[in-house]
Protein backbone atom coordinates (compact mmCIF):
# COMPACT_ATOMS: atom_id res chain seq x y z
CA UNK A 1 0.00 0.00 0.00
CA UNK A 2 3.02 2.28 0.47
CA UNK A 3 3.66 2.43 -3.27
CA UNK A 4 -0.03 3.13 -3.87
CA UNK A 5 0.39 6.41 -2.02
CA UNK A 6 2.62 7.66 -4.85
CA UNK A 7 -0.27 7.49 -7.31
CA UNK A 8 -2.74 10.31 -7.90
CA UNK A 9 -5.90 10.07 -5.80
CA UNK A 10 -9.59 10.52 -6.57
CA UNK A 11 -11.82 11.13 -3.53
CA UNK A 12 -15.14 9.28 -3.39
CA UNK A 13 -17.98 8.98 -0.87
CA UNK A 14 -19.82 5.90 0.40
CA UNK A 15 -22.54 6.13 -2.24
CA UNK A 16 -20.04 6.15 -5.12
CA UNK A 17 -18.14 3.32 -3.45
CA UNK A 18 -21.37 1.32 -3.16
CA UNK A 19 -22.05 1.67 -6.89
CA UNK A 20 -18.47 0.68 -7.71
CA UNK A 21 -18.87 -2.34 -5.44
CA UNK A 22 -21.94 -3.49 -7.36
CA UNK A 23 -20.17 -3.05 -10.70
CA UNK A 24 -16.97 -4.79 -9.63
CA UNK A 25 -18.79 -7.80 -8.17
CA UNK A 26 -20.98 -8.16 -11.27
CA UNK A 27 -24.21 -7.62 -9.35
CA UNK A 28 -25.63 -5.43 -12.13
CA UNK A 29 -23.96 -6.88 -15.23
CA UNK A 30 -21.30 -9.27 -16.43
CA UNK A 31 -19.41 -6.11 -17.46
CA UNK A 32 -17.31 -4.97 -14.50
CA UNK A 33 -15.34 -1.92 -15.66
CA UNK A 34 -15.91 1.83 -15.98
CA UNK A 35 -17.26 2.73 -19.42
CA UNK A 36 -15.86 5.15 -21.98
CA UNK A 37 -17.93 7.70 -23.91
CA UNK A 38 -18.82 5.35 -26.77
CA UNK A 39 -20.00 2.62 -24.42
CA UNK A 40 -22.05 5.14 -22.44
CA UNK A 41 -23.79 6.29 -25.62
CA UNK A 42 -24.58 2.70 -26.59
CA UNK A 43 -26.28 2.04 -23.26
CA UNK A 44 -28.23 5.31 -23.41
CA UNK A 45 -29.42 4.54 -26.94
CA UNK A 46 -30.22 0.84 -26.67
CA UNK A 47 -30.77 0.09 -22.97
CA UNK A 48 -28.62 -2.98 -23.55
CA UNK A 49 -24.90 -3.74 -23.47
CA UNK A 50 -23.18 -6.92 -24.66
CA UNK A 51 -26.61 -8.52 -24.98
CA UNK A 52 -27.64 -7.73 -21.41
CA UNK A 53 -30.38 -5.32 -20.30
CA UNK A 54 -28.69 -2.25 -18.80
CA UNK A 55 -30.86 0.70 -17.72
CA UNK A 56 -27.85 2.72 -16.48
CA UNK A 57 -24.36 3.15 -17.90
CA UNK A 58 -21.21 2.82 -15.79
CA UNK A 59 -19.81 6.24 -16.68
CA UNK A 60 -17.55 7.64 -13.96
CA UNK A 61 -16.77 11.37 -13.89
CA UNK A 62 -15.68 12.21 -10.32
CA UNK A 63 -17.18 15.45 -9.04
CA UNK A 64 -15.24 18.25 -7.34
CA UNK A 65 -12.59 20.74 -8.40
CA UNK A 66 -9.67 18.74 -7.02
CA UNK A 67 -10.97 15.47 -8.50
CA UNK A 68 -11.54 17.09 -11.89
CA UNK A 69 -8.12 18.70 -11.89
CA UNK A 70 -6.58 15.27 -11.34
CA UNK A 71 -8.86 13.53 -13.86
CA UNK A 72 -8.08 16.02 -16.62
CA UNK A 73 -4.35 15.25 -16.33
CA UNK A 74 -4.58 11.46 -16.30
CA UNK A 75 -3.63 9.39 -19.33
CA UNK A 76 -4.11 5.83 -20.56
CA UNK A 77 -2.03 3.28 -18.66
CA UNK A 78 -1.84 5.38 -15.50
CA UNK A 79 -3.11 4.09 -12.13
CA UNK A 80 -5.16 6.39 -9.89
CA UNK A 81 -6.10 5.52 -6.31
CA UNK A 82 -9.59 5.77 -4.83
CA UNK A 83 -9.66 7.54 -1.47
CA UNK A 84 -12.66 7.30 0.85
CA UNK A 85 -12.56 9.03 4.23
CA UNK A 86 -8.78 9.25 4.14
CA UNK A 87 -8.25 5.58 3.29
CA UNK A 88 -7.15 4.07 -0.02
CA UNK A 89 -9.97 1.64 -0.85
CA UNK A 90 -9.09 0.76 -4.43
CA UNK A 91 -7.63 1.96 -7.72
CA UNK A 92 -8.49 2.52 -11.38
CA UNK A 93 -6.22 1.52 -14.24
CA UNK A 94 -7.03 4.31 -16.68
CA UNK A 95 -7.94 3.25 -20.21
CA UNK A 96 -9.27 6.60 -21.43
CA UNK A 97 -10.04 10.13 -20.24
CA UNK A 98 -12.95 11.81 -22.02
CA UNK A 99 -15.38 14.70 -21.71
CA UNK A 100 -18.59 13.54 -20.10
CA UNK A 101 -21.74 14.26 -22.12
CA UNK A 102 -24.29 15.94 -19.83
CA UNK A 103 -27.15 14.60 -21.92
CA UNK A 104 -26.19 11.12 -20.70
CA UNK A 105 -26.64 11.89 -16.98
CA UNK A 106 -30.23 10.57 -16.72
CA UNK A 107 -29.01 7.07 -17.56
CA UNK A 108 -25.93 7.00 -15.33
CA UNK A 109 -25.61 4.54 -12.44
CA UNK A 110 -23.93 7.13 -10.21
CA UNK A 111 -26.91 9.46 -10.66
CA UNK A 112 -29.66 6.84 -10.55
CA UNK A 113 -30.97 8.17 -7.24
CA UNK A 114 -31.04 11.82 -8.28
CA UNK A 115 -34.81 12.03 -8.80
CA UNK A 116 -35.38 10.44 -5.39
CA UNK A 117 -32.89 12.59 -3.48
CA UNK A 118 -33.46 15.97 -1.90
CA UNK A 119 -29.95 16.91 -2.97
CA UNK A 120 -28.72 17.25 -6.53
CA UNK A 121 -26.16 14.61 -7.40
CA UNK A 122 -23.24 15.57 -9.57
CA UNK A 123 -20.69 14.31 -12.04
CA UNK A 124 -17.69 16.19 -13.33
CA UNK A 125 -16.66 17.31 -16.80
CA UNK A 126 -13.96 14.68 -17.33
CA UNK A 127 -14.76 10.98 -17.21
CA UNK A 128 -12.41 8.05 -16.59
CA UNK A 129 -12.82 4.59 -18.10
CA UNK A 130 -10.95 1.39 -17.35
CA UNK A 131 -10.67 -1.65 -15.12
CA UNK A 132 -10.64 -1.05 -11.37
CA UNK A 133 -10.09 -2.90 -8.11
CA UNK A 134 -11.60 -2.56 -4.63
CA UNK A 135 -9.60 -3.89 -1.71
CA UNK A 136 -12.53 -4.90 0.52
CA UNK A 137 -13.80 -8.27 -0.69
CA UNK A 138 -16.75 -8.65 1.71
CA UNK A 139 -19.37 -8.47 -1.05
CA UNK A 140 -17.52 -11.06 -3.12
CA UNK A 141 -17.29 -13.29 -0.03
CA UNK A 142 -21.08 -13.02 0.44
CA UNK A 143 -21.63 -13.80 -3.23
CA UNK A 144 -19.37 -16.86 -3.02
CA UNK A 145 -21.18 -18.06 0.13
CA UNK A 146 -24.55 -17.75 -1.64
CA UNK A 147 -23.29 -19.63 -4.68
CA UNK A 148 -21.92 -22.36 -2.41
CA UNK A 149 -25.27 -22.68 -0.62
CA UNK A 150 -27.12 -22.93 -3.96
CA UNK A 151 -24.71 -25.62 -5.13
CA UNK A 152 -24.79 -27.51 -1.83
CA UNK A 153 -28.59 -27.46 -1.50
CA UNK A 154 -29.29 -28.03 -5.17
CA UNK A 155 -31.82 -25.20 -5.04
CA UNK A 156 -33.70 -24.68 -8.31
CA UNK A 157 -36.54 -22.39 -7.26
CA UNK A 158 -34.79 -19.31 -5.89
CA UNK A 159 -36.81 -16.28 -4.83
CA UNK A 160 -35.47 -12.82 -4.03
CA UNK A 161 -36.93 -10.22 -1.66
CA UNK A 162 -35.54 -6.72 -1.04
CA UNK A 163 -36.12 -5.39 2.49
CA UNK A 164 -34.98 -2.40 4.51
CA UNK A 165 -36.43 -4.17 7.58
CA UNK A 166 -36.55 -0.81 9.35
CA UNK A 167 -37.74 -2.35 11.59
CA UNK A 168 -38.38 -6.02 10.81
CA UNK A 169 -42.03 -6.59 11.73
CA UNK A 170 -44.72 -9.28 11.61
CA UNK A 171 -45.66 -8.41 8.03
CA UNK A 172 -42.05 -9.01 6.98
CA UNK A 173 -42.15 -12.34 8.81
CA UNK A 174 -45.28 -13.40 6.95
CA UNK A 175 -43.81 -12.27 3.63
CA UNK A 176 -40.66 -14.35 4.16
CA UNK A 177 -42.63 -17.42 5.28
CA UNK A 178 -45.04 -17.18 2.34
CA UNK A 179 -42.05 -16.97 0.03
CA UNK A 180 -40.31 -19.97 1.61
CA UNK A 181 -43.42 -22.12 1.04
CA UNK A 182 -42.94 -21.92 -2.73
CA UNK A 183 -39.14 -21.80 -3.00
CA UNK A 184 -36.11 -23.98 -2.43
CA UNK A 185 -34.16 -20.93 -1.28
CA UNK A 186 -35.05 -17.32 -0.46
CA UNK A 187 -32.45 -14.56 -0.84
CA UNK A 188 -33.29 -11.57 1.35
CA UNK A 189 -31.39 -8.51 0.17
CA UNK A 190 -31.00 -6.25 3.20
CA UNK A 191 -30.77 -2.74 1.81
CA UNK A 192 -29.94 0.69 3.16
CA UNK A 193 -32.57 3.32 3.86
CA UNK A 194 -32.47 7.02 3.09
CA UNK A 195 -34.79 7.78 6.00
CA UNK A 196 -33.18 10.34 8.30
CA UNK A 197 -34.58 8.58 11.36
CA UNK A 198 -33.71 4.93 11.03
CA UNK A 199 -32.47 1.93 12.95
CA UNK A 200 -28.76 1.34 12.40
CA UNK A 201 -27.97 -1.04 9.55
CA UNK A 202 -25.91 -3.38 11.74
CA UNK A 203 -28.79 -3.73 14.21
CA UNK A 204 -31.16 -4.58 11.37
CA UNK A 205 -28.68 -7.16 10.10
CA UNK A 206 -28.47 -8.72 13.58
CA UNK A 207 -32.28 -8.88 13.74
CA UNK A 208 -32.56 -10.64 10.38
CA UNK A 209 -29.81 -13.10 11.29
CA UNK A 210 -31.50 -13.77 14.66
CA UNK A 211 -34.87 -14.43 13.01
CA UNK A 212 -33.29 -16.61 10.33
CA UNK A 213 -31.37 -18.72 12.84
CA UNK A 214 -34.18 -19.16 15.37
CA UNK A 215 -37.49 -19.14 13.51
CA UNK A 216 -36.84 -20.43 9.99
CA UNK A 217 -35.77 -23.79 8.51
CA UNK A 218 -32.02 -24.25 8.23
CA UNK A 219 -30.42 -23.10 4.98
CA UNK A 220 -33.69 -21.93 3.44
CA UNK A 221 -32.94 -18.20 3.70
CA UNK A 222 -29.75 -16.33 2.82
CA UNK A 223 -29.37 -12.73 4.00
CA UNK A 224 -27.39 -10.76 1.41
CA UNK A 225 -26.18 -7.43 2.83
CA UNK A 226 -26.07 -4.38 0.53
CA UNK A 227 -24.92 -1.81 3.07
CA UNK A 228 -22.90 0.65 0.99
CA UNK A 229 -25.49 1.81 -1.54
CA UNK A 230 -28.92 3.43 -1.52
CA UNK A 231 -29.60 2.47 -5.14
CA UNK A 232 -32.20 -0.02 -3.89
CA UNK A 233 -33.57 2.19 -1.10
CA UNK A 234 -37.28 3.04 -1.11
CA UNK A 235 -37.53 0.53 -3.97
CA UNK A 236 -37.07 3.47 -6.33
CA UNK A 237 -35.11 1.46 -8.92
CA UNK A 238 -37.07 -1.79 -9.37
CA UNK A 239 -35.27 -2.52 -12.64
CA UNK A 240 -32.02 -2.79 -10.69
CA UNK A 241 -33.73 -5.13 -8.22
CA UNK A 242 -34.69 -7.41 -11.10
CA UNK A 243 -31.17 -7.43 -12.51
CA UNK A 244 -29.45 -7.96 -9.14
CA UNK A 245 -31.85 -10.77 -8.22
CA UNK A 246 -31.27 -12.52 -11.54
CA UNK A 247 -27.50 -12.05 -11.43
CA UNK A 248 -27.39 -13.81 -8.06
CA UNK A 249 -29.36 -16.80 -9.25
CA UNK A 250 -32.99 -15.92 -8.49
CA UNK A 251 -35.73 -16.88 -10.93
CA UNK A 252 -38.49 -15.12 -8.98
CA UNK A 253 -38.73 -11.67 -7.38
CA UNK A 254 -41.41 -10.85 -4.80
CA UNK A 255 -42.42 -7.21 -4.38
CA UNK A 256 -45.22 -5.43 -2.55
CA UNK A 257 -48.29 -3.91 -4.15
CA UNK A 258 -47.20 -0.49 -2.83
CA UNK A 259 -43.71 -0.89 -4.27
CA UNK A 260 -42.81 2.57 -5.56
CA UNK A 261 -41.60 2.74 -9.13
CA UNK A 262 -43.17 -0.39 -10.61
CA UNK A 263 -45.66 1.72 -12.58
CA UNK A 264 -48.60 -0.69 -12.63
CA UNK A 265 -51.04 -0.32 -15.52
CA UNK A 266 -53.80 -2.37 -17.16
CA UNK A 267 -53.96 -3.57 -20.76
CA UNK A 268 -56.91 -5.72 -21.86
CA UNK A 269 -57.75 -6.26 -18.16
CA UNK A 270 -54.30 -7.68 -17.43
CA UNK A 271 -51.91 -6.12 -14.95
CA UNK A 272 -48.60 -5.00 -16.43
CA UNK A 273 -45.63 -3.12 -15.00
CA UNK A 274 -42.52 -1.48 -16.38
CA UNK A 275 -40.73 -4.63 -15.24
CA UNK A 276 -42.34 -6.81 -17.90
CA UNK A 277 -39.43 -6.36 -20.32
CA UNK A 278 -36.99 -7.48 -17.62
CA UNK A 279 -39.13 -10.49 -16.74
CA UNK A 280 -38.63 -11.73 -20.29
CA UNK A 281 -34.99 -10.74 -20.75
CA UNK A 282 -33.91 -12.19 -17.42
CA UNK A 283 -36.31 -15.15 -17.31
CA UNK A 284 -37.50 -13.75 -14.00
CA UNK A 285 -41.00 -14.15 -12.61
CA UNK A 286 -42.14 -11.01 -10.74
CA UNK A 287 -44.82 -11.57 -8.10
CA UNK A 288 -46.74 -8.56 -6.75
CA UNK A 289 -48.17 -9.26 -3.29
CA UNK A 290 -51.05 -7.32 -1.71
CA UNK A 291 -50.52 -5.30 1.46
CA UNK A 292 -50.51 -7.23 4.75
CA UNK A 293 -52.40 -5.88 7.79
CA UNK A 294 -53.64 -7.07 11.18
CA UNK A 295 -57.45 -7.30 11.32
CA UNK A 296 -59.04 -7.01 14.77
CA UNK A 297 -62.05 -8.97 13.50
CA UNK A 298 -60.13 -11.80 11.86
CA UNK A 299 -57.75 -11.71 14.85
CA UNK A 300 -54.79 -12.45 12.62
CA UNK A 301 -52.50 -11.14 9.91
CA UNK A 302 -54.31 -10.93 6.58
CA UNK A 303 -53.91 -9.40 3.14
CA UNK A 304 -56.09 -6.47 2.16
CA UNK A 305 -57.43 -8.64 -0.69
CA UNK A 306 -58.52 -11.51 1.57
CA UNK A 307 -60.02 -9.51 4.46
CA UNK A 308 -63.66 -8.36 4.13
CA UNK A 309 -63.74 -6.06 7.16
CA UNK A 310 -62.41 -2.79 5.77
CA UNK A 311 -59.76 -0.30 6.87
CA UNK A 312 -61.53 0.65 10.12
CA UNK A 313 -60.72 -2.85 11.42
CA UNK A 314 -57.20 -3.06 10.00
CA UNK A 315 -53.97 -2.12 11.75
CA UNK A 316 -51.26 -1.28 9.25
CA UNK A 317 -47.56 -1.92 9.68
CA UNK A 318 -46.34 1.66 9.38
CA UNK A 319 -42.53 1.63 9.88
CA UNK A 320 -42.45 5.20 11.19
CA UNK A 321 -45.04 4.45 13.87
CA UNK A 322 -43.20 1.34 15.06
CA UNK A 323 -39.89 3.24 15.08
CA UNK A 324 -41.48 6.06 17.08
CA UNK A 325 -42.32 3.56 19.81
CA UNK A 326 -38.86 1.98 19.76
CA UNK A 327 -37.00 5.30 19.72
CA UNK A 328 -39.00 6.31 22.80
CA UNK A 329 -38.06 3.10 24.58
CA UNK A 330 -41.50 1.49 24.25
CA UNK A 331 -41.95 -2.11 23.16
CA UNK A 332 -44.36 -2.31 20.22
CA UNK A 333 -47.36 -4.65 20.66
CA UNK A 334 -46.58 -8.26 19.81
CA UNK A 335 -48.99 -8.12 16.85
CA UNK A 336 -46.63 -5.57 15.26
CA UNK A 337 -43.18 -6.88 16.18
CA UNK A 338 -42.07 -10.18 17.66
CA UNK A 339 -41.19 -9.49 21.36
CA UNK A 340 -37.76 -11.12 21.06
CA UNK A 341 -36.94 -8.78 18.17
CA UNK A 342 -38.21 -5.71 20.02
CA UNK A 343 -36.06 -6.75 22.97
CA UNK A 344 -32.99 -7.10 20.78
CA UNK A 345 -33.52 -3.68 19.17
CA UNK A 346 -34.21 -1.85 22.45
CA UNK A 347 -31.16 -3.41 24.10
CA UNK A 348 -29.05 -1.96 21.27
CA UNK A 349 -30.75 1.45 21.22
CA UNK A 350 -30.56 1.88 25.00
CA UNK A 351 -27.29 0.37 26.16
CA UNK A 352 -27.02 0.07 29.98
CA UNK A 353 -30.39 1.78 30.33
CA UNK A 354 -31.06 0.52 33.84
CA UNK A 355 -28.95 1.26 36.90
CA UNK A 356 -29.19 -2.28 38.33
CA UNK A 357 -30.73 -4.61 35.78
CA UNK A 358 -30.06 -7.69 37.92
CA UNK A 359 -32.03 -6.38 40.92
CA UNK A 360 -34.83 -5.17 38.67
CA UNK A 361 -35.21 -8.61 37.10
CA UNK A 362 -34.93 -10.46 40.41
CA UNK A 363 -37.61 -8.29 42.02
CA UNK A 364 -40.01 -8.30 39.07
CA UNK A 365 -39.85 -11.76 37.49
CA UNK A 366 -40.13 -15.33 38.73
CA UNK A 367 -36.99 -17.45 38.49
CA UNK A 368 -35.92 -21.06 38.80
CA UNK A 369 -34.30 -20.49 42.18
CA UNK A 370 -30.86 -20.49 40.64
CA UNK A 371 -28.69 -17.41 40.28
CA UNK A 372 -29.27 -16.17 36.73
CA UNK A 373 -27.37 -13.25 35.25
CA UNK A 374 -29.80 -11.00 33.40
CA UNK A 375 -29.27 -8.54 30.56
CA UNK A 376 -31.35 -5.64 29.29
CA UNK A 377 -32.54 -7.89 26.49
CA UNK A 378 -33.72 -10.52 29.00
CA UNK A 379 -35.62 -7.79 30.85
CA UNK A 380 -37.58 -6.70 27.77
CA UNK A 381 -38.46 -10.28 26.85
CA UNK A 382 -39.71 -11.11 30.36
CA UNK A 383 -41.59 -7.83 30.60
CA UNK A 384 -43.54 -8.58 27.44
CA UNK A 385 -44.53 -11.97 28.90
CA UNK A 386 -46.04 -10.16 31.89
CA UNK A 387 -47.91 -7.80 29.59
CA UNK A 388 -49.41 -10.81 27.82
CA UNK A 389 -50.65 -12.42 31.07
CA UNK A 390 -54.43 -12.12 30.91
CA UNK A 391 -55.75 -13.80 34.09
CA UNK A 392 -56.32 -10.46 35.87
CA UNK A 393 -57.51 -8.41 32.89
Regions found by a protein language model. Give the residues of each.
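Non-catalytic terminal extensions that flank enzyme cores
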Residues: 1-236, 242-251, 255-393
